[in-house]
Amino acid sequence: MNNDKRPLYIPYAGPALLETPLLNKGSAFSIEERMFFNLEGLLPEAIESIEEQTERAYQQYQKFDKDMDKHIYLRNIQDTNETLFYRLVENHITEMMPIIYTPTVGAACEDFSNIYRRGRGLFISYPNRDRIEDMLNNASRQNVKVIVVTDGERILGLGDQGIGGMGIPIGKLALYTACGGISPAYTLPVVLDVGTNNPQRLSDPMYMGWRHTRISGQEYDNFVDEFIQAVKRRWPDALIQFEDFAQKNAMPLLERYKNKICCFNDDIQGTAAVTVGSLLAACKAAKSKLSEQRISFLGAGSAGCGIAEAIIAQMVSEGISEAQARSQVFMVDRWGLLIDDMPNLLNFQQALVQKRDTVNEWDLADNNVSLLDVMRNAKPTVLIGVSGVPGLFSEDVIREMHAHCKRPIVFPLSNPTSRVEATPADIINWTDGNALVATGSPFEPVVHNGKTYPIAQCNNSYIFPGIGLGILAVNARRVTDEMLMASSRALAECSPLAINGHGALLPPLEDIQKVSRKIAFAVAKKAIEQGKAPKNSDERILDKIDANFWQSDYRNYKRTSF
């Protein structure tokens, strides 16, 4: 037990204290605490340390065979004793991250109403739009500093899950704490229940959300704005992370609010930041620069285009012109390569097209330019998948890429595992062990010709906890593109492969708290440099990061009046 910090004064006692997850210690309450807080007789006689509690919890966890059962078990601990939950997860982060987040959280979102046990966070439904202020005041957390909000329309690669999407904000905020040290007392998951267009949810008698098709257009925009304005009044300094909004809303919401409040979209900006960081590490390992690469994307939605824009910004920072950088990026969607004369291009796609005059010089069978056509003609050195469609990185595509690139960089990033564009084993086999691979979901190391290849998980959890920690540490007022770029560079500096010439592209999850601290420092420094946070010395920034880094230790309690 960590008694270094001053005691907490608690206004609860008896069963109410045991039913408060942020404060409950279970069998770790001391003799004095049991007496002062009316807990005598409510707990077994033994007084245990958090280490003993964690060992028991892990033994129970190991008895479950199915990942979903493990997820439900961990969520139950989280809703009972949050300190124990985070100690358990931190002790087994590599094993448990896939359980509390991707890929298992996807299935948990699909089955949310059926596995529901206890409310967590806020469910803000459209029929109650006139009472958003009251709902925020009802939150169990009063000093909220980080909000993750979704409307449940684009959950991972699984589509519209309605309020089932709440599993994502809950999981993301668990990682803010486990990876980034942000106190769970400062976090709030929110789902905006605007209905669902998923017929399975609407017809499911167990579905707990608003049983209505989704609102859209001005009604939707007004509802989201009412929520944002209410948050600004209740918690004016809170960081808001937009999560898993559909393509048609994700970019417009980000553009509308990024210069008005402290916010970012993790699917667009967080994914871009971790991908750029991984690419910088891969380029260093391949003894090249990002500005020298030719990059092909499969998937030209808001996430793919967000990554592309971040890559272009980094390439320009390395000394090439923006026009040159854009000419080296090839966006492929379901209709083929994006070309400037194509109809119905989305606003955020228009700056990422190739010129028809350029494509006319290619050797093509017809005007529909496929990914394989891009491989044969543009000869990309980097291939990034954000399509959500499994198997599209075929053997022909990967072998064609390897034919002109000795060390191809291949990132099949779609989540969950069932949606990945190609498995790492196939990519490594098809390139005879030469590909540099990172994936969006966790994969076991690949053995090829007697050599073991660890697979980096290019997961946003390497980025967003550190961004949040840096913002909180220096009270940054905005999240800028430059702050995100700083996070990418800091992540790249942690790459074992880039540093040592062997190992994975990204550091092991066991080091993720160190990585988050490094990213937090880089983000905080950039925020100060840009005038988005009060001035602080480097030493003071580090002190503030330490002061904000929550530890999963029990505090001593003192009784206050109640």
Swiss-Prot record:
GO terms for cellular component: cytosol. NAD(+) binds at residues 154, 267, 415. Its cofactor is Mg(2+); Mn(2+). The active site is at 101 (proton donor), 172 (proton acceptor). CDD domains: NAD_bind_1_malic_enz (cd05312). Divalent metal cations. Prefers magnesium or manganese. The keyword Acetylation does not apply. Its EC number is 1.1.1.38. It comes from the Bacteria. Transmembrane segments: none annotated. One of its GO terms (biological process) is malate metabolic process. Keywords: Metal-binding, NAD, Oxidoreductase. One of its GO terms (molecular function) is NAD binding. InterPro entries: Aminoacid_DH-like_N_sf, Malic_enzyme_CS, Malic_N_dom, Malic_N_dom_sf, Malic_NAD-bd, Malic_OxRdtase, NAD(P)-bd_dom_sf, NAD_malic_enz_proteobac. Homotetramer. This is NAD-dependent malic enzyme 1. The gene is maeA1.
